[in-house]
């Protein structure tokens, strides 16, 4: 999937309530079924774990019950992973049966064994037409972070990302030493604990300990990202914290938002009880050719919070409806000329 300036304009106008459909030019790849596969490489098996259903949410808490290792709008989960095993053959996971299957495809062409491909299915119903490409690439960005962590466990890394209107290709390379001290079991625990919190009942934090649910990102803004393919990052991360009195602040930029202002923007969570609001901003001047990878990067950075800030009673909810243009232009004057708010993660602790 490729993202263009027209798509960004559609996304931006949507925040004003103006709806223009993002055009999806993706072409469907044709895979020929070969057979079911019983035993596969452990590394491949762990990669497919990322795409398995980990748990089912409670019906009295959320209408979006399916949970995997990454978030997906309305739990649609439209992404599929294919792994090259050579000679135009690919492994994938049948999400309905839970079995591994082998397919043949002659369209992709020659690629190294172990190359990963993410292919997007169509959203099953007519939702989010104005932001569907945005949501799709953000979701893939979340997946890419998980893949990078899992690769590290197996002494591998993402070398580069290639995008077209059929798939996202992820090229993998071996490394001598893992960067993170993380076992698969611990990674799996983070995945199981990941939640966006209840939707059908009010989230409360009567303790009002707003240090709970806070996450300080380990990834720095100036880190080199293979996901960008050496292009320039046009993304800025902005973290607002609950001051425990009347709203959320970012003291370095002298930004303050009241609970009332934030609750009027997004009323599914009461900001009086939330701890942190991490916003991801995109430069207005970004060249069209860099859009796809920078939006993937935003999803990648958001997943660090969604994954590593996961534990019992913690929630990390991705939010596309960040702040309205009026609030952005009035309260973020130091940033509004250069950036647009593109994505956010709302984090906190909730009482059972």
Task: For each feature predicted by the language model, list its residue ranges.
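N-terminal accessory segments that position/regulate proteins before the catalytic core
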Residues: 1-352
